[in-house]
Amino acid sequence: MTTIRVKENEPFDVALRRFKRTIEKLGLLTDLRAREFYEKPTAERKRKKAAAVKRNYKRIRAMQLPKKMY
C-alpha cells in the first residue's frame, strides 16, 4: 500500500501530485486497468505477441538509414 505523508504547511495539490507520481512509478494504475476485465490466456498471448512484433519493427526502422531526400 502506498502512503504519502503530508508535510506541515504543504498544500493539498502538492501532496496529491506526489501521490500520483508514486502511483505512476509503481505502475499500479496500468496493472489495475489490465485486471479490470478478464482476458483469456490466448488473447493475452496474442496481444503481447503483437506488441513485441510492433516494438521489433519500430526498433528496426530506427536503425535503418534515412532515405535520401533529393
UniProtKB/Swiss-Prot annotation:
<dbReference type="InterPro" id="IPR001911">
    <property type="entry name" value="Ribosomal_bS21"/>
</dbReference>
<dbReference type="Pfam" id="PF01165">
    <property type="entry name" value="Ribosomal_S21"/>
</dbReference>
<comment type="similarity">
    <text>Belongs to the bacterial ribosomal protein bS21 family.</text>
</comment>
<dbReference type="InterPro" id="IPR018278">
    <property type="entry name" value="Ribosomal_bS21_CS"/>
</dbReference>
<protein>
    <recommendedName>
        <fullName>Small ribosomal subunit protein bS21</fullName>
    </recommendedName>
</protein>
<dbReference type="GO" id="GO:0006412">
    <property type="term" value="P:translation"/>
</dbReference>
<dbReference type="GO" id="GO:0005840">
    <property type="term" value="C:ribosome"/>
</dbReference>
<keyword id="KW-0687">Ribonucleoprotein</keyword>
<dbReference type="GO" id="GO:0003735">
    <property type="term" value="F:structural constituent of ribosome"/>
</dbReference>
<keyword id="KW-0689">Ribosomal protein</keyword>
<dbReference type="InterPro" id="IPR038380">
    <property type="entry name" value="Ribosomal_bS21_sf"/>
</dbReference>
<dbReference type="GO" id="GO:1990904">
    <property type="term" value="C:ribonucleoprotein complex"/>
</dbReference>
